[in-house]
Amino acid sequence: MLARMSFALLCACLVATPALAKNKTDFSCTGVFGPDSSEALLIETYGADNVVTGQVPGAEGMEAQATTVFPNDPDKAMQFGWMDNEARQGLGYVDLPPSIDGPHGVHVGMTVAEVLAINGKPFAIGGFWWDYGGYAQIAEGTLANADDATCFLSLRFSPADDYQPDLDTSSVAGEVSIPTDEPLLEKLDTRVSTVSVSFPDVGD
């Protein structure tokens, strides 16, 4: 679990922003999405039949414990990781579903161009097709790191599965940094595949 959590927090630090709660498209790091969240609160909020805790796949073939809400509904499924696995409380991260907008309105399914429009500044994306690929690396703009943020936003991008077989994708594969003006991103129909909000470990 420590490996899964450390990875989630590391990726979150690449794209950090304070969460607001002013309108429909803003996200608030409070309640079930706040640092004091717990499995008990999820059950109270969503119902016991919709909350399942167990092992979930992680990077490099590892598994970690997490709580999934609405596990049988891809449009609503949310995954929660806990700072305290035994008590299942203290939110470490939550992966948001396509039906919920994250901070500043970002959500699963957005194109690179759409995220770029929100950010207002170019950024980079890690190369694809490996365990740690596809994460946004944003240094400037609306979604850039905020030192005083109470929670952190991490975006992961993925290319479409069905692209032209003769397309040379070597420049966007593996441990490389891809600028947002790379034409291949559009040709591959690259979109946000994960919107994750994480919290710092207050014990660090």
Summary of predicted features, one role per range:
Residues 16-18:
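N-terminal signal peptide c-region/cleavage motif recognized by signal peptidases
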Residues 1-7:
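Bacterial N-terminal signal peptides that target proteins for export
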Residues 20-204:
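Short helix/turn-capping signatures at newly exposed starts of structured segments
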